[in-house]
Amino acid sequence: MNVLRKIVKKCRDEDTQKPSPVSAPPYDDDLWLPPPEYVPLKELTSKKNMRNFCVNGEVKACSPNGYSFRILRHILGSFNEIYSGNHRMIGLVKVVVGLALSGAPVPEGMNWVYKLRRTLIFQWADSRGPLEGEELEYSQEITWDDDTEFVGLQIRVGARQCHIQGRIWCINSNSRACQLWSDMSLQTQRSEEDKDSSLLLE
């Protein structure tokens, strides 16, 4: 049985030997996620727990033999148990990681690099989420290694409250970006009154 674990092995940009060619993720519906879909906010009935965050995220995926999103979903499926950052921001981190991975990767040595820099508006349920003025600087390396393949994820997410106009993070059930986390702990509640906003339940 494959076991998810953190190990010492690192993603290296260069190899003193002949570097192994890195395969691009396959362009297959099951494996590849197109750019995320945003649902614009029309009307929000309550602004009590809504905050703008300037977020930047970077995910480096390292695998000498290429990788599929099936593996990434499997790794991220245990995110709640292995997340080492501020737990009041775990929902925000999940969204940023999911959006970053839904973008286009840039090759960098042995790595595929996904970056995201956006201003997003998040809303938390029942006064949960980060404290007023709280910021996040989170970085972690997560690796998957078994007898046949190795995949390493280096995740960095920064978030700070800001007052410039952002875009509402809303769940569109038809969006492939949203489906990345659909079988995980990130859940949303939507009512008819707030149908264009989303609550991150943590």
UniProtKB/Swiss-Prot annotation:
Transmembrane intervals: none
Keywords: Host cytoplasm, Host membrane, Host-virus interaction, Membrane, Phosphoprotein, Viral budding, Viral budding via the host ESCRT complexes, Viral envelope protein, Viral matrix protein, Viral release from host cell, Virion
GO CC terms in record: host cell cytoplasm; host cell endomembrane system; membrane; viral envelope; virion membrane
UniProt keyword Phosphoprotein, yes or no: yes
Membrane topology of this protein: Peripheral membrane protein
Entry's Gene Ontology molecular function annotations: structural constituent of virion
Classification via InterPro entries: Rhabdo_M, Rhabdovirus_M_sf
Motif (PPXY motif): 35-38
Compartments in which it is found: Virion membrane; Host endomembrane system; Host cytoplasm
Chain spans, region Essential for glycoprotein binding: 115-151
Record bears the keyword Membrane: yes
Superkingdom assignment: Viruses
A biological-process GO annotation: viral budding via host ESCRT complex
Main location, first listed in the record: virion
Site (Involved in the inhibition of stress granules formation and contributes therefore to virulence): V95
Subunit and interaction comment: Homomultimer. Interacts with nucleoprotein and with the cytoplasmic domain of glycoprotein. Interacts with host ATP6V1A; this interaction plays an important role in virion uncoating after viral entry.
Family the entry assigns: Belongs to the lyssavirus matrix protein family.
Written domain comment of the UniProt record: Late-budding domains (L domains) are short sequence motifs essential for viral particle budding. They recruit proteins of the host ESCRT machinery (Endosomal Sorting Complex Required for Transport) or ESCRT-associated proteins. Matrix protein contains one L domain: a PPXY motif which potentially interacts with the WW domain 3 of NEDD4 E3 ubiquitin ligase (Potential).
Described function: Plays a major role in assembly, budding and uncoating of virion after membrane fusion. Completely covers the ribonucleoprotein coil and keep it in condensed bullet-shaped form. Inhibits viral transcription and stimulates replication. Plays a major role in early induction of TRAIL-mediated apoptosis in infected neurons. Inhibits the integrated stress response (ISR) in the infected cell by blocking the formation of stress granules.
Further comment found in the protein's record: Most abundant protein in the virion.
The protein's name: Matrix protein
Organism, as annotated: Rabies virus (strain CVS-11) (RABV)
Native organism taxonomy: Viruses, Riboviria, Orthornavirae, Negarnaviricota, Haploviricotina
